[in-house]
């Protein structure tokens, strides 16, 4: 009985490790593919650039000092653009 239980648990552990390794390889292969732009990330970058520059332009029109919009997540506002820190 103990031997059967040990064998089942061993097989389950091997299966979990194999599945995890396969998922990691799949993720790495997707990241390593050349020529596939990450459209979601590009859209976020463009959105941050747009938000920061538009925010400053609106404040300038109201004759106020341009208080740059805070960029979050490792980005900062510089020259009316969000740039990666």
From Swiss-Prot:
Recorded GO MF terms: toxin activity
UniProt-listed Pfam families: Toxin_20 (PF08089)
PROSITE patterns, alphabetized: HWTX_2
Prodomain positions: 23-48
Localization per Swiss-Prot or TrEMBL: Secreted
Tissues with expression: Expressed by the venom gland.
UniProtKB keywords: Disulfide bond, Neurotoxin, Postsynaptic neurotoxin, Secreted, Signal, Toxin
Cysteine disulfide partners in this protein: 52-66, 56-77, 71-82
Superkingdom of the source species: Eukaryota
Signal peptide feature range: 1-22
InterPro entries: Hwtx-2-like
Gene Ontology cellular component terms for the protein in this record: extracellular region; host cell postsynaptic membrane
Cited function: Postsynaptic neurotoxin.
Membership in a protein family: Belongs to the neurotoxin 12 (Hwtx-2) family. 02 (Hwtx-2) subfamily.
Protein's name according to its UniProt entry: U4-theraphotoxin-Hhn1g
Source species of the chain: Cyriopagopus hainanus (Chinese bird spider)
């Amino acid at each position: 009985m103990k031997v059967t239980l040990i064998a089942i648990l061993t097989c389950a552990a091997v299966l979990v490790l194999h599945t995890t390794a396969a998922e990691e390889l799949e993720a790495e292969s997707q990241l390593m593919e050349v020529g596939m732009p990450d459209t979601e990330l590009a859209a976020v970058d463009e959105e941050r650039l747009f938000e920061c520059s538009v925010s400053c332009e609106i404040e300038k029109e109201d004759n106020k000092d341009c208080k740059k919009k805070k960029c979050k997540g490792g980005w900062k506002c510089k020259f009316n653009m969000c740039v990666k820190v």
